[in-house]
């Protein structure tokens, strides 16, 4: 198979697998928290990316946890993946897949940087998880922004340390010999 075709197929196969997985993890984070609080899950949709529930008892800790769990579960899974990453593996698919596996959840952290700024400007989307987290936790948007920046930087540092970025770049730049 032509190397360029292999790279493109790896990219599309990775996205085809990882976008639904990210949605499941994001909504799964909300779902797990709701279930822990005694809620009954009424809908869980991958297409449309949402879940709904009835009931449950949320408190000053669990309500902010519910709003942040959609970010935290995918990021936690990405961190575990990074820790188990094998940098010596030379498979083009593995390197592209691994890059995408950490890019999607790590990139979603940026919303938690942008939304607090919008929140301070009175422009945050009312339905956004980060805005709901700020409202329910009572934390300053600056604290949320700083936490998101630190989490984002930590993920980038670990991905760099594990050579995920370098191996992705090597796979993308590689040419048939």
Language-model segments: which ranges?
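Small-residue-rich helix-interface/hinge motifs
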Residues: 14-63
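Active-site scaffold of zinc-dependent metalloenzymes
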Residues: 1-16, 35, 75-79
